[in-house]
Regions:
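Short alpha-helical elements
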Residues: 1-211
Length: 211
């Protein structure tokens, strides 16, 4: 079922022209597997999930980290589930290879690393982030303003995954297979929403059809 759903998602994305994109948004979001204080010894997630911390939410949790690339319109391009304690850049490494050469990736401070960014730039994947205040080299103010605007798009793309029933952060799944299936379904739903709006003029949030 998962393979069929993913094939449909890729077909919708192709119809939407994802193959012509070269600007992408990169971020991660927590995916909770089991309550933080609940016993994990008999959980199906033991051995693959991990304890982690989401700085943006100031939240400790047990589960996974969803790393995802989207287009500027918020269409999912590539994604990967990793243990919650995975480094942001290690998570990104799992999906950046899927990008075509001469791609530009907009991300946040969690992905700062001059050497790491330079290594990816050599492959034609250019990663842009804001700078920390203590870094010697700083971006031009106008560029940081642009990055902040793009960051709002990143947050918007992930907010869609958290809407409605079975948020990607709380899938309520009891098995690894179930969690992966529900995560894929949620991501595919975002692509389908964009597809219906583009080709049929249907807004699935309001159930209205535009002329």
């Amino acid at each position: 079922m998962g393979a069929l759903l993913n094939a449909l998602r890729q077909a919708w994305a192709s119809d939407l022209g994802v193959q012509w994109e070269n600007h992408f948004l990169l971020d991660t979001t927590p995916v909770i597997a089991v309550g933080y204080r609940r016993d994990k010894h008999h959980s199906d997630f033991l051995g693959s999930a991990a304890y982690g911390y989401c700085a943006a939410r100031r939240m400790k949790y047990f589960g996974y980290k969803l790393a995802m690339l989207t287009t500027l319109d918020g269409m999912p391009y590539a994604f990967e589930l990793l243990p919650a304690n995975a480094d942001e850049r290690a998570a990104a490494d799992e999906i950046l290879d899927s990008l075509p050469p001469n791609s530009y990736v907009w991300s946040d401070k969690g992905f700062i690393g001059d050497e790491w960014q330079a290594q990816w730039a050599e492959t034609g994947r250019h990663i842009w982030t804001t700078k920390r205040e203590n870094q010697l080299s700083q971006n031009p103010p106008a560029f940081d303003q642009l990055l902040n605007c793009v960051r709002e798009r990143v947050e918007g793309a992930f907010d869609i995954l958290k809407e409605g029933g079975r948020s990607v952060e709380h899938t309520l799944a009891h098995t690894i297979e179930g969690l992966c299936s529900r995560t894929l379904a949620k991501i595919s739903g975002v692509t389908l929403r964009l597809y219906l709006r583009r080709f049929l003029g249907i807004d699935v949030l309001t159930y209205t059809i535009t002329a």
